[in-house]
UniProtKB/Swiss-Prot annotation:
Its EC number is 2.3.1.191. It comes from Neisseria meningitidis serogroup A / serotype 4A (strain DSM 15465 / Z2491). Catalyzes the N-acylation of UDP-3-O-acylglucosamine using 3-hydroxyacyl-ACP as the acyl donor. Is involved in the biosynthesis of lipid A, a phosphorylated glycolipid that anchors the lipopolysaccharide to the outer membrane of the cell. GO terms for molecular function: N-acyltransferase activity. Homotrimer. One of its GO terms (biological process) is lipid A biosynthetic process. GO terms for cellular component: membrane. This is UDP-3-O-acylglucosamine N-acyltransferase. Keywords: Acyltransferase, Lipid A biosynthesis, Lipid biosynthesis, Lipid metabolism, Repeat, Transferase. It is an enzyme of class 2 (transferase).
Amino acid sequence: MIPATYTLSQITARLGGEWRGEDTSVTAVRPLADAQAEHISFLANPKYKAEVHDSSAGAVIVSAKAADGFEGRNLIVADDPYLYFAKVARLFSPVVKARGGIHPTAVVEESATVPASCEIGANAYIGANTVLGEGCRILANAVVQHDCRLGDEVVLHPNAVVYYGCTLGRRVEIHSGAVIGADGFGLAFAGDSWFKIPQTGAVTLGDDVEIGSNTNIDRGAMSDTTVGNGTKIDNQVQIGHNCKIGSHTVIAAKTGISGSVTIGSYCIIGGGVGTVGHIEIADKTTIGGGTSVTHSITESGKHLAGIFPMSTHKEWARNAVYIHRLSEMNKRLKTLEQQLSDGKDTQ
């Protein structure tokens, strides 16, 4: 594929911002340290200003505040350099559109609705009574079981699976190995064994949701597990049955959300977070990586973390001993407080 080429004036005409210096041409985005004359880079954090002076980049995206320090360089001045960089990167890597057609090895059930604009890859499967929107891409070995509804321009990457009865909004993207709508982990103890509770709900994903590789979103026990518009979920995340996740929330890799958790909109959840079930997390909550969330978070905008920062093994071992002694130390402290209080009373 021939790389796209844009001048700075062409970029700003499309995306806004102000170009300064020469109206040079660029063919790709690169980090400051790797960029060459044909590349455009960006400065999002002022502490890396020295790297701009050392960089061979043909142009750099900067904020108005930072631009004054780079006279003689080719610049694009933007309000948010990082967001602007992302939009420039999209110019050079446009969304792939569906090539209409069904591969000869794909299986599409007769009762399925597949518009001519959809692309169905090798060995893909479309189940009975499933309806695809315009321009969907169901790539090699991907599976959409029966009675599903997919909006326009949905993409299922190779080996992604959508179980029966699920609903995906417009422009949803499901990466390889992800499973949408497998049975939730619902069991009732029968005295000497576990009885599986039928999971009769499904999964509903809003518009512009993205699901990373090998992530699982379980179907609801009775009502649907839901994910709101614009939410992005990383690789290897587990979303339990009956969860309700709001719009424009992001969840990083290896996080586990237990069943029946409600998460608000615009939340940021770091990697390796774990939650107990049946709790609520308010809008705009930020949870640091590795945190164990054991109770509801009811106040919007809280920033929470629950792990020790990295330390030497010797320091960690010493602190671990102190943790085990906290209960004993608390009792001793209460005894001392009581003794002090008794002493004051006798004076």
